[in-house]
Amino acid sequence: MRPLRNVTAPSISRRRFLHHAAAMAAGAGSARLLIAQTGTSQKPEAPSATRAAHRVFVASFSHETNTFHPVRTESYYYPKTDVRPFNLAVWKDAGLELVPGVSAHPSGGGTVEGKACREALDRILGSLRASLPVDAVFLRLHGAMFAEGIGPAESVLVEEMRNVLGPKIPIACTFDLHGNIPMRLARFGDILIGHKTAPHTDGGQIAEQAGSLLLDAIRGRIRPVSYILPVPIVLPGEKAMTTAEPLRTLVDEARRIEREGVAGHPARILAATIFVGCAWTDSPDTGMSVMITADGSRKAARAAAIHLAGRIWDARGQFAFGCETAELEEGVTRALEAEESKVLLTDSGDNVTASTPGDLPIVLRHLVERKVPHALVFGIQDPQSVARCFAAGEGKTVRLSIGAFIEKRFGPPFEAEAQVVRLVKDRRAAAVRIGGVTTVLGAAFMGGPGDYEPFGLEPSDYKVVVTKCGYCFPGQDRIAPRHIMLLTPGAGDMRLDRLNYVRRKRPAFPFEKDAQFDPEAAPA
């Protein structure tokens, strides 16, 4: 067998990503559209018995759209598809050729503008046509991209790829556990698998699982069939973590079904995924769902989906925040009075991992006005203030109008005299001190373990550390022995009843407490 080699699709060029925040700093509404050229289209061919290797088209297309973000996403960036994540261990000696197509990712957090999305879809599809013939397709998706006039864009991509390929070429897709998955996707994708962990730690595992199944499908060992069953429950991800009940037990049941199958159906269950969904994407598909891939039996896939959906529905009242929570004032008071030497506060309403603007100064203002000593806010997206800091220089004092340059619905910028502590040129960011509070300005950093060092900051030097996320990600839990999630306002508000939903499914729990759901009524 020939080893894996990378084959570049013809006539494809890509430009580097221009960051959204840089464009905003220049006064633009979003980053400019970056275009990838594709080659001429060809008609699909059946796999050739004379070719030395099976050709697998690989690409990524993902976004966690926050429709409550005040600014539309009007552009995509087109990074060169990195085939390294597709160099799977299960493919090492399989004699496959990886054919990288165009990958596309929106450059902002808000609802994707329809024209830009349509162009991105056409670029990806054009690169697929230019790469034909192929024997299979492997896509890395998210599942929560939402575009004006298009809807669930990732699902639309799979549908349109199926139209190009015809019915026989297998398509494998991996998803984030927080995807909002349309039921119709199962008609077009063959192998559909999502994360089983939140916080996510199993990306490599699900890629290997999908890759193994795709290889089996290419070789004719399996005939994958998928089924998707929506469950009318809409929750913030912080109420559905696989480290806590009830999702931990529900995911264990999904794993058991993969091992043992479903009663009364001899067909093997190849993959079973429970999706939490993304609550900040207001769409008809928003919410929990079950995705099953079975070997040759839609009935078995449906039965497994019904079983898991019923278990989820029965547990709907058990979902709760998996960490300590508090309103802003109370949370800060608890942190200051805590016996623990350090406390991590997360600004959940402006949680950048939920595609918020990341520019709200609400927590910073509160800490400064309360004269809190030894606090670190990491960080606030604000390229204008960063520019002023660079103009002033390290050690200088400068008047700043911090934050609220995108998100203006929750209060004005925070006006303050700040001392410039550190400038980091390659990140175009600045650390400043206001009273006893140090804050990092620039991109909306999540505050992961590797983020602090370039600024000369050590989280252990502070009693209170604030980051713009919800639950703790791997590594963040080492910052402090105690974590309090602040229930702050913003586009990522954990209090979903404070958000203005227009398109979500109705009835849905917990919005409609008396919502009814019968999984047995799922289409055959």
Stretches with model-predicted labels:
Residues 313, 426-524:
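Extended hydrophobic packing segments that form well-structured cores
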Residues 11, 32-55:
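C-terminal segment of N-terminal export signals and the immediately downstream linker at the start
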Residues 57, 62, 114-118, 131-223, ...:
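Active-site histidine-anchored catalytic micro-motif
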Residues 47-93:
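N-terminal amphipathic/basic leader segments beginning at the initiator methionine
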Residues 1-12:
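N-terminal secretory signal peptides
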Residues 59, 64-71, 84, 96-129, ...:
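Metallocofactor- and cofactor-centric catalytic cores in central/energy metabolism, strongly enriched
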Residues 13-27:
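N-terminal export leaders
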Residues 238-435:
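Hard-cation-handling environments
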